[in-house]
Amino acid sequence: MLTLADGRKDGKEFISMAPGYFPEIAPELWNDWKWQLKNRVTTLAQLEQHLVLSEEERAGVLLSGDKLALAITPHFFNLIERDNPDCPIRRQVIPRIEETWASPYDMADPCGEDSHMPVPGLVHRYPDRVLFLVTDRCASYCRYCTRSRVVSGVGEQELHTEFEAAFRYLEEHTEVRDVLLSGGDAL
């Protein structure tokens, strides 16, 4: 259940406290994005404090940490169904063992971005538009992330955007009319 935050007059701001994994948190803290980042769920112990994990989830948490970090904001965690391992939101952010399985068809760069990166952090695949990777950190890490190889600060590769070089590139390439900023998805 979503409830209006106490003291709000416009009726537009709300807090989501259901199912209530963090009932003791005051609305002013709950609505503070800095508090949300500081209090992310990042460990197996934190998950098990609130959820009964399936064997696939527990193994996934234990074995996937070197590929993509575990991080879930309290707000997003509150949307997870406690007793349903098939809850879509739960599947989005809690690792499963299948995530660690390797296939001979796996690709190091599944989006093919590296070959279209004139400077680190800027993908120029189409004539008049670029993708500017501005950060490699997100509030919560989605398990299906197409950039999981370069986000969260773990794994073999990291994103090292060269901002000044990217700005120079954009100044020199006047055909670019559309710059898509990516990375660091919202809470």
For every predicted segment, state its role.
Residues M1-H124:
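Flexible, acidic/Gly-rich N-terminal and inter-domain linker regions that tether
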Residues R137-Y141:
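Short pre-active-site segment immediately N-terminal to redox-active cysteine/selenocysteine motifs
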Residues I94, D106-L133, R143-L187:
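Conserved Radical SAM active-site core
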